[in-house]
Amino acid sequence: MNHTHKTNWRSLSFAAIICCCSTIAACHREVTREPASLPNISVIDDHGRPVSLSSLKGKVVLLDFIHIGCPGVCATLVSKFGEVADSLKPELGSRVVLLSVTNDPEHDRPEQLLALARSSDADLDGWLFVTGKPDDVDRVIKAFGVNNERMPDGSPAHITQVFLLGTDGQKKREYRGMLMKPQAVVSQIRDAMTQVQGGAS
């Protein structure tokens, strides 16, 4: 009887070890998965021109998602982006790009985005307001783990996350947009630029 119990315990212990090893391997796969990054697609800017997102590599990018007809949350995000842009004037466009992507591409046309940009006094040399094919825009949104959800009336839900991307196009930081402190973001953008200057990967 005792011999049988010992055999059973050994079997259970071996099974537990196998289970633990499998769990550790699964956790390792989760940790090493590919980081969020801009997909290699083209979008349309506020002048109706195609822009390849891959062309932004080599620059630090601050990314958000907005849409026309969103006076509350989106207006706040635009205002905060404006503060960031004003603090980065020397580097804006050459080393840093602000990228505002509409999450309502079915309705937001380039001319509407241009009107929004102008009414916000946006520096269009380094701040892109873009739309595109719905499938392409969805790819950008989902690349950062966000769902482009709809409200009961069919209008797009607010996306409040803001993303800081390194020069390789990969996500370095994520912010809650409504709580984002522009000057803190500016400091982190400058840190990202300094890392590039210093040859850091």
Regions found by a protein language model. Give the residues of each.
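Structural microenvironment flanking redox-active thiols in thiol-disulfide oxidoreductases
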Residues: 78-140
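Short active-site neighborhood of thiol/selenol oxidoreductases, capturing the structured segment around
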Residues: 54-75, 81
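N-terminal "domain-start" segment that seeds a small globular fold
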Residues: 27-54, 79
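Short, small/polar residue-rich loop motifs at catalytic or cofactor-binding pockets
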Residues: 37, 60, 157-159
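Thiol-/selenol-based redox modules, centered on thioredoxin-like
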Residues: 151-201
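Sec-dependent bacterial lipoprotein signal peptides
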Residues: 1-25
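Sec/Tat-exported extracytoplasmic proteins
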Residues: 60, 67-69, 85-92, 120, ...
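Hydrophobic beta-strand anchors of alpha/beta hydrolase catalytic cores
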Residues: 62-63, 98, 162
